[in-house]
Every structure is written in C-alpha cells, then in structure tokens.
Amino acid sequence: MKDIKSYETETKSIGSGQVLSCAYSCEKAKLVLKEMINELVLDLFEKMVMTDQIVLTVEYDTENLKSNYKGEISTDMYGRKIPKHAHGTRNLEEWSASGKKIMKAGLSLYDEIVDPVLSIRKLYVTANHIISNTKAEEKKQYQQISMFDLIQAENEGQEKVDIKRDDIREKNLQKAELEIKKRFGKNAIMRGISLEKGATAKERNDQIGGHKA
C-alpha cells in the first residue's frame, strides 16, 4: 500500500493519493475515502488554509475487464488495460476547512462519478484553490463570532449563529485532535470509521516511506 501526499504552493492545492493493497468494492473504498478526507481536513487546519473546490479521481482494478465490462478502456502507468478512471470536481459554496462541508462534497461527488459495480484500486482526493484563512475570511467577509454574538442571537438570526457555533466547536475538536496526534502519535486517537473492516488509516500511520516502521 502506498500513500502519496503533496502540498503544491504554485498550483495552490493539497492532496493525497492511495494505492490500495487489493481491489476494493465501491462501498469499501468509500470508507477509505472518508479517512482520506478526514486527514485532508486536518491538514488544511494545520496549515491554516481553506479551499473552495474538491477534486476526486478513482482508478479501477484491471480485473474488472474479466467481467462483462463494456465501457471505455485506458492504460495505466504499467501499460495494463483498465476501465477508464472516474474523475470529477465539486465546488463549495465558499472557502472552507470545515470537515462537514468537505466530507459532504467529497462523498456526493464519489457517488456521482463512481461505477458501483467496478472494483477500485486507487483513490486521489485534492483540495484546490488553497488560500490562507486570513485571505479566505477577507473574501467572504467572515467575522469571528464572540460570546456576546451568541447572547445576541436574536439580532443575527438563530440559524446563522448555530452555524458559527458549530464551526467553532469543530475547530476546537480539530485543534485537540492535532495536538494529541503530535504528542502521542497519529494512532493515539482514531475516528470510529478507522476501526471498521477495510479501513487503512492505522496501517498507513504505521508506515514510513511506504514501509512499516
């Protein structure tokens, strides 16, 4: 299993790619994608940047050609024939590093572009148009909420305040998770999905340069 990460300042993108150890079903690969998105969101938070576009690429396993596959065929980097990969983008309503918003965008895009019948071998997810939190907030004229703002909820509209409150809660959780991982290791705290069968985060965290430590 290989894990590829990149932070491209010139193209303003942050992404990761994973080569699965074996062919995964659509649902099983979706679990891995959730883990990858969680890691991507934490990476955005750590770098203090936001994105307004999620890009997803899914490559299918060559074994699919032995079934009754009738779709387009392409060639992988090893010269093998494989079903044409699935690729798509999803724009967010505004610049964000919100796990909820990015997860929703990534999973809806996955459901839209992936053929559920085909087995999957590679996943790539990228956050595009990366800008600093400061620039993002300037662009969307975002103002940090204070306790006074919460008390004056009736003046701003309860729904708007609830959204801001959720954002603050999520950022606090991200900060706590990041601090724990830095202090005790990436496997010190794991999300529930990473304990399910087929999840790969724990194994990838145990690896250094693609090999187990």
Label each PLM-derived region with a short phrase.
Residues 1-213:
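Basic, low-complexity intrinsically disordered segments
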